[in-house]
Amino acid sequence: MTETVVVTGGLGRSGRWICDRLAESYHVVCVDVDHPGWEIPERDSVDFRAVDVTDGGEIRDVVAEYDPDGVVHWAALPSPERHAGSRVFETNVTATYNVLDAAGRAGADIVLASSESAYGMAFAEETPVPAYLPMDEAHPMAPEDPYGTSKVAGEEIAKMVARRDGVQVASIRPSWIQYPGEYNCRDVATGDLAGGAGNCWSYVDVRDVAGIVEAALDADGAGHEAFHAAAADNYVGRPTAELVEEYWGDVPAECELEGDQSALSTAKADGLLDWSPDHSWREAADAEVAEPNLLAE
């Protein structure tokens, strides 16, 4: 019997890639604030539900209807710069609690969209130098903005649900997500280094994001774990330690970067999820790849 997974934010820019990937082996319930249209035919393996995930009753109803094996919570306000800070924080934290609470009580394994922004570098007024490089998932998290703080709070909710309900919860901390043929990071690469210092010039291809979500769902783990999702290299094409020293004037005392190695280590995902990134800007920036289609062919 095919397992069922509910994906919130499933019609979002990266969410649709996740749904498309999962639909190859799961029955996917694509949840978003709007339905794509009642007269649009669906793929056999995809259902759509219009749900406001800040309303706990709505997401509980969907979880009760489908009794999913897994829930991927990918819906969020993705930046502190487009909405009032209070709205970003309240929306993200409330939605995360509602979705994870419903999923945990239903006994579903969970994959949560966290963020590299939880470390506090991306939106800081003065970008702090990392404590060590490469950064692993144990690196201190000290955000100064509502978005990054909402992600830290979200991971605490994830830990609570894992403890309370005994389900597996994976918090994915993606780097700056890029899309085949549309690598905006390369525009930053040709400009001032300050434009990429907030994540040490790291990035990740959306196809690799979809891959780590699937790997987390398929994993046989327990409790809560956080994982980086990042490409193996930086997007500038120069040694990462050289970029760090040029921008901050020095490198951390503990710096074990080699060449253009990413500042975000993915060794944990490799070890526990058997996942590693497949894509680099060198081939993906100009790649012609069709956008995912969640509708019937």
Where are these regions (language model features)?
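Conserved Rossmann-fold NAD(P)-dependent oxidoreductase catalytic core, especially the SDR/UDP-sugar
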Residues: 98-144
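Glycine/proline-rich active-site loop of Rossmann-fold NAD(P)-dependent oxidoreductases
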Residues: 164-168, 179-189, 215-227
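Mid/C-terminal beta-alpha module of Rossmann-like enzyme folds, strongest
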Residues: 210-266, 271-272, 294-296
